[in-house]
């Protein structure tokens, strides 16, 4: 076997191994993705237009005329433009922690959220259980976010919270 042939064979084998490793990592990440929190009607963020949380003073109701699928659920939008913004970069607009209560995640739990108890912090949408919990969370946003980020990797694979219930 010539040295050139051996080098090409080794390169092909190495590239094949890298491709296999990347594929395994990708599918493992997808398989471990958490379930999106949805309300009793199966809608994320209560059927509101998630882009409007970033662009309007208050969230706008979504419409069945403008929808997109992401993270296994149908998202509703007030306009085709907002739908298109979302589909171009859903991770930019989808709420943190798959729409679960940010305060609860900081306390190592997955709890439902209220679509009107929210805040955008540094370009990220955070939902909370209720306006009262939202106020508590806002007293120490940096501290709660630090704890949430540390807790989320263990919580994410768990099933989504039920639409009714919670521990508050």
Predicted features, each with a name:
Residues 69-82:
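Beta-strand cores of secreted/periplasmic/IMS beta-sandwich domains, seen most often
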Residues 3-5, 18, 167-168:
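Short, aromatic- and cysteine-enriched interfacial helices/patches
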Residues 27-71, 91-168:
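Intrinsically disordered, low-complexity terminal tails and linkers in eukaryotic proteins, enriched
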Residues 1-11:
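N-terminal secretory signal peptides that target proteins for export/translocation
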Residues 82-84, 134:
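Primarily extracytoplasmic ectodomains and periplasmic/lumenal surface modules that are beta-strand-rich
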Residues 12-28:
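Bacterial N-terminal signal peptides
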């Amino acid at each position: 076997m010539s040295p050139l042939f051996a080098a090409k064979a080794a390169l092909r084998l190495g590239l094949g191994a890298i491709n296999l490793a990347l594929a395994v990592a990708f599918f493992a990440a997808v398989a471990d993705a958490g379930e999106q929190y949805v309300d009793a009607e199966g809608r994320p963020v209560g059927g509101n237009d998630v882009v409007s949380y970033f662009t309007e003073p208050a969230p706008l109701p979504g419409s069945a005329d403008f929808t997109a699928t992401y993270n296994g659920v149908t998202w509703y939008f007030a306009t085709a433009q907002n739908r298109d913004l979302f589909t171009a970069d859903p991770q930019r607009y989808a709420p943190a922690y798959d729409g679960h209560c940010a305060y609860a995640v900081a306390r190592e739990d997955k709890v439902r959220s209220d679509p009107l108890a929210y805040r955008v912090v540094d370009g990220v949408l955070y939902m909370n259980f209720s306006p009262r919990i939202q106020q508590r969370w806002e007293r120490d946003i940096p501290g709660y976010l630090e704890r949430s980020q540390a807790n989320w990797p263990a919580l994410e694979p768990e099933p989504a919270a039920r639409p009714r219930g919670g521990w508050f």
